Amino acid sequence: MLFRSTGGATTSASAPTPAPGVAVAAPIPSLAAGLDAEDDEDTPAVLKVAETLTIVVEEEPSLEDAPTTVPSAALKEEAAAPEPAQSYSDSEMLDVVAQALENGRVDLYLRPTVTLPERRPRYFEALTRIRTRSDELITPSAYLSVAESSGMIPLIDNVQLVKSVQALRRLGPKSRIKGFFCNISVRTLLDPEFFPELVEFMEENSGLSESLIFEVNQPAILALETSELGSLDTLGALGYRFSLDHVSDLDVDFAGLRDRHFRFVKVDSKTFLHDMEVGGKGLPGADMKSYLDTFDLKLVVDQVDDEGTVAKLLDYGVELAQGNLFGAPKPVSPALLRELEEADAA
């Protein structure tokens, strides 16, 4: 099996069949349309989806119009975010997601990935939040299952990619921020309607290939057949790189990852430290950092929430980390981009 150092049976990760009674999202539109309005600040970019759903990707206001502070209500880490005040049935949540897509209420949030020991942001993980009509924030943990079963995940990925490209363009090539990790689902990579448009869009923005990193989770990748991995090769041929997230099985074929254009491996702190201190069946955590280095793979330790964990990570030479301790996700806004620019100039 690819990405695993030992053999075993695999199961296909083809797009799931929609759940009974759940509406299916319309075909995916052109991603390039999401940037059509970039030169006209008064016109939102509109992505048309067949005749039933229109996705709006609103252009961010200019830096001159930026507020001096970022709304504090939007600065909560997803893991610490409260459950929505209202309880939603699947059909109600489906309507919330569809309305958010139609009305430009799918927001991009950025969570810092910092260097150690300096704790300087060098990367950001791009995340999405959905706002209801009453501006209640809905995190992926609440809407993901419905979005997946209804086929709306590619639409949400669509918005995330367009907004990530917009933000990276604003930061510019001289920024010290090296890139964004953009979470993308395997369903999106396998979608026959969406993927050709994705390739075209990424080819048009190939100048950002060093800055935009596609992030996929290990369980989904392990479930792919070799024949389904062509999407990774296609994007890799354009110069784009990948990050493997949610790594819980350290029995990994790192050479295979490298050959498939993976350059980052993310492991949560508990998994990483447990293997260091107790010993796991796969690669011992104590050797993981140096071993990854031999394949030019960067280790990122996630879910770092306290100083004690940082001290242990430093003992093992970890150089990149993210978690509540270093900053919660913030909504992309002119204020945030200005903050990043000022950090660059410092």
Regions found by a protein language model. Name each.
Residues M1-L2:
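Short, small-residue-biased leader/transition segments that mark boundaries at the very start
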Residues T10-A33, A37-A45, T52, S62, ...:
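Low-complexity, Pro/Ser/Thr/Gly/Ala-rich intrinsically disordered linkers and tails that serve as
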Residues T43, V186-T188, E215-A223, Y240-A346:
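EAL-family c-di-GMP phosphodiesterase catalytic domain
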Residues L53-Y88, I177-I184, P331-V332:
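Flexible, glycine/charge-rich interdomain/linker segments that couple
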Residues I55, K76-V146, G327-P331:
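Active-site core of bacterial EAL-family cyclic-dinucleotide phosphodiesterase domains
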Residues T132-L137, L161-V165, H246, G323:
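Short acidic-capped amphipathic helix/loop micro-motif used as an active-site/signal-coupling element
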Residues M152-S227, Q303:
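Catalytic core of bacterial c-di-GMP phosphodiesterases, primarily the EAL and HD-GYP domains
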Residues P196-V199, S227-G230, G279-A286:
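Charged helix-capping and loop-helix junction motifs
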